[in-house]
């Protein structure tokens, strides 16, 4: 409202500053009749704080008990003591503790279930891994038993055949075994065998001259069941000479085969060596693929030959006498 001319309006610091800046004391609006008075808002707590009167302030400043009570009340509000007392009255603390305890129990039970499930899964996986191994072991055992049975049957058949063979066949088998075991020293073994056979023939010739019934029985026991006890000394000597000739022919054939196998193995080894040499030659670095940057990155030049380095770096007649380091 506009101030009357007879009354002196209450002027404050703000009004004085506005008048100095050119304000004429008029209000807002079209007719300029807006309020120009200062609006003061008093707080509800008149005894304490900014809105308190002077008398209240004086009384409280001297009364320390009231100030301490007010201070404690403010601290209680800030710390939430009133809420704590209210919860205790209504027994809400106990309920919340029970709820939190139940939640923790549920979480722990879920964790235990998850762990048990994971353990069961791992156990099942381990069992599934173990099962095929057991099957394989059973199969391998069955295969081994089959092989053992087949080997036993073959051994029994071979033993029966050996029993039926004559002494000439046994001697030939022994000579064959000796020749196969001594294939590497064939020349020496042949000479020794010939000497032994000559000695045996001489002994048998002497025994044939002084043959008797007892000698015939001993010779029949040493020979197989197929050889007859009534065979004469001449027939024995002829059969032995025939067996000796056969053994010699067999030994010769085996020696030839061993020599051929040795020659073939030597030729194959020489061919393999030639192929290795060719492969080594192929591994040499081609100059078209190499670059100068690879030489700069390389820690040593030993990977390249002298010719490769000259082709990469270019021919330099002034530095031709210099020897480059190559592979050792």
Curated annotation (Swiss-Prot):
Gene Ontology terms, MF aspect: nucleic acid binding
Compositional bias ranges of the Acidic residues kind: 116-126
Region Disordered, annotated ranges: 97-291
Compositionally biased region (Basic residues): 101-110, 248-257
Residue span(s) of domain G-patch: 10-55
GO CC annotation: nucleolus
Comp. bias (Low complexity): 141-158, 210-240
Signal peptide feature range: none
Name this polypeptide is given: Uncharacterized G-patch domain protein DDB_G0278987
